[in-house]
Swiss-Prot record:
The gene is pgap2. Residues 44-78, 132-146, 201-231 are lumenal. The chain crosses the membrane at residues 23-43, 79-99, 111-131, 147-167, 180-200. GO terms for cellular component: endoplasmic reticulum membrane; Golgi membrane. It is a multi-pass membrane protein. It comes from Danio rerio (Zebrafish). This is Acyltransferase PGAP2. One of its GO terms (biological process) is GPI anchor biosynthetic process.
């Protein structure tokens, strides 16, 4: 192995370069592929257990919590989220550094970027909590993790869109403008899916309707899975 002097410039050179876009795509695909695998396996091998409801009405699709609580689905989901979570923490730190550079002389935006960073950490912690504590193990902890994840995710998206609206206000970069509009559309889409999920959840628990209501809730929740890309 070649020895490099301590004060040499070569010591500060990066060992590995990974394009940010590639890192973001890989980070997003991990939970998406894991979720699809869990749902497919649950429907093929554990259909009755995955689609069971408390009021025992017929159902067609499993919820995320039901799909990832079975075996081996839970291990697939935990593996994909374990690989997925580390880059999310790195991306959150990278965005914080980026915001501080863009808003170096603006206190309000600095505080908002710090709050956005905390929301990103909270979102990731909630995701890990609901992942590694399944609904069949400790339901209250799993439920708290799910609420923490969804709530932090939505507020994180909202704050991110606000910061980027300020960035594009004083920018002529077409790439930054496209990134802002992409983030805004994803926020509106994800927020709409969460609203529908809450509506169908309350309706299902109130009226215990067969099949379609619970299935619609499951589809809505699927779109609330951790696929908020770092665009």
């Amino acid at each position: 192995m070649q020895q490099v002097p301590y004060g040499s410039v070569d010591r500060d050179k990066p060992l590995i370069r990974v394009p940010f876009t590639r890192l973001a795509v890989i980070t997003v695909c991990l939970p998406l592929l894991g979720l699809v695998a869990c749902i497919v396996l649950a429907m093929l091998y554990h259909y009755n257990d995955a689609t069971y409801t408390h009021c025992q009405v017929p159902n067609y699709l499993p919820s995320i919590s039901a799909a990832i609580s079975l075996t081996p689905e839970r291990y697939i989901w935990r593996f994909s989220i374990g690989l997925h979570s580390a880059p999310r923490f790195l991306v959150a730190a990278a965005y914080l550094s980026f915001y501080r550079g863009r808003f170096s002389r603006r206190l309000t935006e600095q505080l908002l970027s710090g709050f956005t960073f905390l929301l990103a950490l909270s979102e990731n912690v909630g995701l890990l909590l609901l992942t590694y504590v399944s609904s069949t193990e400790t339901y209250s902890v799993h439920k708290s993790g799910f609420i923490l994840f969804i709530g932090s995710s939505l507020f994180h998206m909202l704050c991110t869109c606000k910061l980027w609206s300020l960035i594009v206000k004083y920018s002529i970069s077409s790439e930054e403008m496209m990134s802002y509009w992409f983030k805004l559309r994803l926020f509106l889409f994800n927020g709409g899916c969460c609203v529908l999920a809450v509506y169908f959840y309350r309706r299902h628990n109130t009226y215990c309707e067969e099949g379609i209501t619970h299935a619609s809730r499951c589809v809505s929740i699927w779109w609330c899975c951790p696929t908020w890309p770092s665009t």
